[in-house]
Design a protein with these regions (language model features):
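Sec/Tat signal peptide C-region and signal peptidase I cleavage site
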Residues: 26-30
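Extracellular beta-strand/beta-solenoid scaffold signature
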Residues: 37-38, 42-53, 72-84, 104-120, ...
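The right-handed parallel beta-helix/beta-solenoid scaffold, focusing on the short coil/turn
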Residues: 48, 55-57, 65, 79, ...
C-alpha cells in the first residue's frame, strides 16, 4: 500500500474517513491482501482474531505497511483481540510509518465488551501508530475494554499516536475506551465522534501519566 501516516495529528482528522475508505474500496489492495504470516510484518496483511492466555505476542510493522484487523463479528468479548491471564500484546512500527487499523469489528451476546480489543486479569497492551474506526461493543468499550486486578506499577495500557473515530458502546460506558483498575499511558491520541450510553470515555481506578 502506498498510504502513509507518520504522525496522527488533529489536523489530519478530516482526511481519515476517505483514507480508511480507500483501504476497503473495490479496487483496493486491501481486498486481496494475504493473511498475516507471523508477527514480523514486511508487507501489508489482513490479521485474524488473536486470543492470548498468559503468553506474549509482539508484532513489528515495516515502514509503509499495514496490519488490518477488520470486519470481525463475534458473540464474545474482544472483536479482534482477546487477552487474559497477564497476556502481553504489542504492535509497534519498526521505525515511523508502519500502521495498524482496527475497523468495523463488533461483538454481541452475553459477554460483549471491547469492540476491537478486550483485556482482563492484568493483561497488557502496547500499541502505536493505530487507528480504531467504527468498532462496536454491545456493552462497554467501543474500541478497547481493559480491566486489571491489582496495581503492577507499570502501564498496563499504553497507546501512542492513535486515532479513535466513530466507535460505539451500545449499552455501557466508554465509547472509545473503558478502563478499570489499570494504569494507562496515553500520548498523542485523538478522540472524535465516539459514542456511549453515558460517556465518551470512562475510567475507574486508573492512573494517567
Amino acid at each position: 500500500m502506498n498510504m502513509r501516516i507518520i504522525f496522527l495529528r488533529k489536523e489530519y482528522l478530516s482526511l481519515l474517513p476517505s483514507m480508511i475508505a480507500s483501504l476497503f474500496s473495490v479496487n483496493s489492495v486491501a481486498e486481496v491482501l494475504d493473511s498475516c504470516q507471523g508477527y514480523d510484518i514486511k508487507a501489508s496483511c489482513q490479521a485474524s482474531r488473536q486470543s492470548l492466555s498468559g503468553i506474549t505476542q509482539d508484532w513489528s510493522i515495516a515502514d509503509g505497511q499495514w496490519v488490518i484487523f477488520s470486519g470481525m463479528a463475534n458473540n464474545a468479548s474482544g472483536g479482534a483481540v482477546f487477552l487474559q491471564q497477564s497476556a502481553e500484546f504489542t504492535i509497534l512500527p519498526q521505525n515511523e510509518t508502519g500502521m495498524t487499523l482496527f475497523a468495523n469489528n463488533s461483538i454481541s451476546g452475553e459477554y460483549n465488551n471491547g469492540g476491537a480489543i478486550f483485556a482482563k486479569e492484568n493483561s497488557t497492551i502496547n500499541i502505536a501508530n493505530v487507528i480504531f474506526d467504527s468498532n462496536v461493543a454491545g456493552g462497554y468499550g467501543g474500541a478497547i475494554y481493559s480491566a486489571g486486578t491489582n496495581d503492577t506499577g507499570a502501564a498496563d495500557l499504553r497507546i501512542t499516536n492513535a486515532v479513535f473515530l466513530n466507535n460505539i458502546a451500545n449499552d455501557g460506558k466508554g465509547g472509545a475506551l473503558y478502563n478499570i483498575n489499570n494504569d494507562v499511558y496515553l500520548s498523542d491520541d485523538v478522540f472524535n465522534n465516539n459514542q456511549a450510553y453515558t460517556s465518551t470515555s470512562y475510567s475507574d481506578g486508573v492512573r494517567y501519566h
